[in-house]
């Protein structure tokens, strides 16, 4: 991979469940078709928004396979495949590739609180175990550790299949360093919907978005407008959907976005424990915003 090719709008796809808590495969296929119709560039099942900690390896395999089948070459499929045990993360990566993933999203090892060298070695083992491109997922608000820019850049330079980072932080200094120092093949994607506009203005490559579950066309348009330098249009889109982007995190992701999708008639509102439904107060706030935007 001598050139950068991960860019645009990616969706961190929810996992729909039936009332009996099995995966709703019919709803999953509908969600994928909704993304394809909107022109989403990358579809990512089995990540944080997909409730991956509650999915068995067999379920993850089946979800990735269904998404890959439904996409039918119209987008890239990047599977969430990470955990805090390096051997297990390698096994998840191999499982995702076997299921048909075109690339992998691998979360930084959480809870263990590894050193930067430990993080480097974790990703080294994954990169040496598979040949598909890997997206480092840096989300210190969930993992309890930040993958430093120096570590990300070291990995990108040492392994050609370390292809991108999902930088789910508001650390603009780190983002700036990554954008300025990265090798040619390496993409930098934001994981913060609220930062799409400033991130793209800094030279970012795109977003891995939660809101794209609800408004994939609009997120795609926002990214494209910012990429092309049409800041007036980008600001218009950002202004219109700013409140929704904020409400998606009024409680733990993916609870708000799954509630919104249920109100939009796309999935049933079911979560696997320890996630529970939204409070009545927050449901009302989301209902009001969805109505205001004409989404329900």
UniProtKB/Swiss-Prot annotation:
CDD domains: DHDPS (cd00950). Pyruvate binds at residues 49, 208. One of its GO terms (molecular function) is 4-hydroxy-tetrahydrodipicolinate synthase activity. It is an enzyme of class 4 (lyase). It is found in: Cytoplasm. InterPro entries: Aldolase_TIM, DapA, DapA-like, Schiff_base-form_aldolases_AS. It comes from the Bacteria. The record marks 48, 111 as: Part of a proton relay during catalysis. Its EC number is 4.3.3.7. SUPFAM superfamilies: Aldolase. GO terms for biological process: diaminopimelate biosynthetic process; lysine biosynthetic process via diaminopimelate. The active site is at residues 137, 166. It holds the Pfam family DHDPS. It catalyses: L-aspartate 4-semialdehyde + pyruvate = (2S,4S)-4-hydroxy-2,3,4,5-tetrahydrodipicolinate + H2O + H(+). GO terms for cellular component: cytosol. Catalyzes the condensation of (S)-aspartate-beta-semialdehyde [(S)-ASA] and pyruvate to 4-hydroxy-tetrahydrodipicolinate (HTPA). Belongs to the DapA family. This is 4-hydroxy-tetrahydrodipicolinate synthase. The lineage of its organism: Bacteria, Pseudomonadati, Chlorobiota, Chlorobiia, Chlorobiales. The gene is dapA.
